[in-house]
Amino acid sequence: MISTAIQQLVNYGLDTGLILPDDEIYIRNQLLMTMQLDDFTAPEGEVCYTDLESILKTLVDDAAARGVCEDNSTARDLFDTKLMGVLTPRPSIVRANFEERYENEGPQAATDWFYKFSQDTDYIRRYRIKRDLKWVTKTPYGDLDITINLSKPEKDPKAIAAAKLAPQSAYPKCQLCAENEGYAGRMNHPARENHRIIPLTINDSAWNLQYSPYVYYNEHCIVFNHLHTPMKLERATFRKLLDFVGLFPHYFVGSNADLPIVGGSILSHDHFQGGHYEFAMAKAPIEKKWVFPGFEDVDAGIVHWPMSCIRLTSEDDSRLVELADKILTAWRGYSDESCFVFAETDGEPHNTITPIARMRDGRYQLDLVLRNNITTPEHPLGVFHPHAKLHHIKKENIGLIEVMGLAVLPSRLKKEMAELADVLVSRTPAAQYPEELQKHAEWAGDILARHPELSADNVHPILQDEIGQVFAEVLADAGVYKLDEAGRAGFVRFLASVQ
């Protein structure tokens, strides 16, 4: 039985091209060593398999039963990654393959290959990504992408307890560091034996390309500084973003803002996120054209989007860098009390930008989304952040991915929405809702008022649409300049101040 599973994994490696026929005996023996087995009985006849997940489950179940690995969710992930690491070619081979395709077939062929490779190695776990719930909601701002993230593993209680007892280590310094490549992992740090990165040079500095293991959208990649250095938004950031889309014109790339609340979850390591996907914000039109003095050659304007976005387009990327830097510098020091925009309070800076770069019809394009992280007693998590009445759906930071129009919502919503559907269909009074649904009660009442036709047949699409509309409100809350007369006038005042 276990010999069959080992041969199935070898055959999987051969079928995907991770290993070559000359490697078969060697790889089989390396897998035996990893499994702490001494014997192998060649299976009779042709060895077939259905999917990678079931092969790995068979092998990990056996290893756990024999005490080779612990039987909790994290230890199992560490061990199956160790098995896949046996099949994964060394970095030098991967990079040579990528570079050969880039030079001979072009950048898209190179990334197509690397993306498939990152899935074949199980670094991107296809079978987990499929669990994510995804849909599209039509809004006045375009079609917003909504996803309930179920692919990021939630640790079971045994794994959480083991992680607390695990010795602390400062290596690698964070989960983005280049030193993760090939790292075996531990109870409080994921295994990366099957992880490979591609070196890049942008703005004459060493960076790397990898994919996100959680793939929130097509070819979701991470571009990160080779050095563990903090996020910093500056003139060089725009140069790096535009250099990247010059290298990979079929990809967009953007940076999270560099301040808490409006930034991403990792501020300690300078990095960007990109991919082969067009978000609603990229499709959104210009609602007001603008000409910046001295930059008449750059097409500019305000984007029709709930967050405050300036779009710049030019054939000359150096002109975009110069103008974007001018806008960033102006915004860092800009205050407008009438719109509750304060550059700083008590010496703490508040203004920053979320920038996104892409190629559009052979021209360079930058979207600059204005951000401000000021807090008040009324809005302790941020004035320009989802307000409390929306926290039942989304209370986390609005980072780069959300800014562009993709909601990454917590996994708890899958269970809560299934339960909410039942109480809506049965017209259960809000006072009788179970405790975990109380936070949705007011919203649920509004849904019933809007949809008296709600029934068991249509409750799920109605709930999906309503969640999407909440996300549109989330984006509006996070927008510095509101989409009303006062907000638009305030936005124009800022643009006019950029000299």
Which residue stretches match the model-derived regions?
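Helical scaffold of the NTase/Pol beta-like nucleotidyltransferase catalytic core
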Residues: E193-I198, H226-V253
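Catalytic or ion-translocation cores adjacent to nucleophile or general acid/base/metal-coordination motifs
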Residues: A236, V245, P249-S265, G274-S335
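Active-site microenvironments that recognize anionic phosphate/pyrophosphate groups
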Residues: M1-V223, L227-P230, P306, L320-A324, ...
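Short alpha-helical interface elements
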Residues: Y171, I266-D270, E278, G294-D297, ...
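Beta-rich nucleic-acid/ligand-interaction surfaces
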Residues: P260-S268, D346-T352
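Histidine-centered divalent-metal-coordination microenvironment in nucleic-acid enzymes
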Residues: N218-N225, G263-F279, V369
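Hydrophobic faces of well-ordered beta-strands that scaffold small-molecule active sites
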Residues: L209, V253, D270-F272
